[in-house]
Amino acid sequence: MRWLIPLLTLTLSLAACVDSADTPPVESPEAAQQQAVQQEQPQPEQVAQTAQQQEQPAAVQNRLEASQAEQPQARQLAEETPDTPFDPDAVEMAQLIFWGPLDGFFGRYLPIPPAGQALLDQLLAADSPAIDKYIIDLSAFPNPYWEQALDYLKRRYGEALRTVYDSPEIFNFHPEDRATPAYLRFKQALFGSQFEDMAEMMDPDAAIVIDAREIQWGGVRVDGIPPLEFPTQVFPDEAAEWINDTDIVVGVEIDGDARAYPIRIIAWHEMVNDTIGGVPVSLAYCTLCGSPILFDGRVGSEVYRFGTSGLLYRSNKLMYDRNTRTLWNQFSGKPAWGPLVDRDIRLKVLPVVVTTWGDWYEHHPDTTVLSIDTGFVRDYGPGVAYNDYFNSPLTWFNVPVKDDRLAQKDNVYAVRVGEALTAYPIEVLAERALIQDQVGLLPIVVIATANGSGGRAYESSNVLFESADPVAGTLIDANGNTWTIREDSLLGPDGQELPRVGGHNAYWFAITNQTDNGRLWEG
C-alpha cells in the first residue's frame, strides 16, 4: 500500500491548485495575509528555462552563491585528508542545494553539478552514523538526489524499496547521533528549495523540543490541505439532502452552542478555525493518527489560530500559529519549534465526541452542522477521503515506538487531565458501556457512545456508577439514582452535576509516539 503515498501526494497537491479563489472568511487581515498563496507549478518544457533564465529570489540566490564559494573548500578538505572519516556534520551539507522554489516539482530532474555530485558521493560512501538523517531527507523530499539516495537504501538493505518508509531500520538513529546545527541548516535549505514559507518555520537558530531528524514532509505545501476559516453552519433540515444518519461526526457543545463536524468533510481540511459558544477554538484533525482535537485558542491575552504546515512528526501533523508561525505539536498542543517554545505554553483541550450524525441529532435537536458548501472543490462523499488509509492496519510514515499491547491503529479514547493521559480501547469501552478510573489524581467515569465509536469522560467525585445506557443517555449509580448524560456534565439527583473532562479519539500509535507518560487502561 506504500505506493499510495506518491499518488496521495500528487492528488493533494493538484487539489490544492484548483481551490476556489473565494476562500472562507478569516478573522483579521493579518490572518488573511498569512494564509499560503497557491502557486502554479511550471510545465515540463519550462524546466530548462526555469533553471537558467528565471531570476531566483534574493535569499535563494545569495545561498547559491555562498554554496558555490564553499564547495571547492569542501572538496579540498576531502582530498587533503583522505584517511579522515567523512563527517557530514562537519561539512555544510546545505551546499548540496543548487535549485530553488521557482524550479517547482520539476527541480528534482535538474542536472546535478559536479561539486554537488562529489559531496553526495562522499556522503553515500561514508561509514558514519551521522549520514542516516541526511539520507532520509534526501530520499523522502523531492530533489535531484532522490533516486541515488533510494538506490543507496536498496543496496544497504537488500530490499525492493519504493519509499524510504519501506526501510524503517534507517530511522533507528545511532545513540551518539543528534540533530546538529549543520543538519538543521541543511534541512531548512532542502525544504526551502521547494517551499520558502515552510522553511521559514524551520529556523536553525530557534528553540526546538522535538527531534528534527524525525520531522518529515507530508506531501503538501503550507496550507496545501486548506483549513476551514469560520465555515458556514446549517440547520439539520438544510443538510438532510446529503447527510446520512450513519455519517461519523465530531460533536461539540460549548455554552449551549451544539455543532457537528462530519469527518467526511473535515478529513479534507484537517483544521477548522471557529468560534463556538463565544470561545475561539481550533479543531485540529490529524487524519494520519485518527485524532480530532479541539483546542481553546486563548492563552493569556493572546488568541491563536492555526494552519497546516505540511510537516509531520512521527506521523502526526505539525500545525503552525498565524501569530508567530511557530510549529506546534498537534497531539500535545504545545509549541515544538520556533519563537513560542520557551514560553511554557500548552493549549487547553476541550471535550469532543465521535459518534454518528443520527445519534448526535437525536440528543441535540437544536444542533447545527458544518455546511458541505465549503468554498473548496472536493468530493465530500461518504468514505472518500483517506478511505484506504482508514481501513488499513498500516501507517504511511515512520512511527519508531511500537507497543504490541494494541495494534498500531487500534482506536482509543484519550482522556486528558493536566499532563496525565489515559487511553481506553474503544472496542472494550463499547462492550462495557462505562469504565470508572483515575487519571492523574482525578477520579473519572468514561462512557461509550451509542454506536460504540467514541466516548465521553466526566469527573466522578465520590459517585459509584453501576450501569450505563448510552442509547438512552443515562447512567445508574450504586444508590439507584438516574443520571443524565449531557455534553457539559452529568446531571444527577437534586441537580448535582459532574463536569466533563477533555478527551478525544486517537490511534494507539499516537499515544505511544507522542506522549512520554501515556497510560493504557487494561482493566
Task: Give the residues covered by each predicted segment.
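C-terminal motif of bacterial Sec signal peptides marking the signal peptidase cleavage site
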Residues: L14-A16
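Mid-to-C-terminal functional-domain signal that highlights helix-capping/loop sites
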Residues: N62, R75-A78, G100-G107, D132-G523
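Bacterial signal peptide processing site
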Residues: V18-S20
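N-terminal propeptides/low-complexity segments immediately following signal peptides
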Residues: T23-Q35
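N-terminal low-complexity, Pro/Thr/Ser-rich intrinsically disordered segments
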Residues: A32-W99, G107, L124, M198-A212
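Positively charged n-region of N-terminal signal peptides that target proteins for export
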Residues: M1-L4
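Structural detector for internal amphipathic alpha-helices that build alpha-solenoid repeat scaffolds
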Residues: E79-Q95, R108, P113-A126, I136-D137, ...
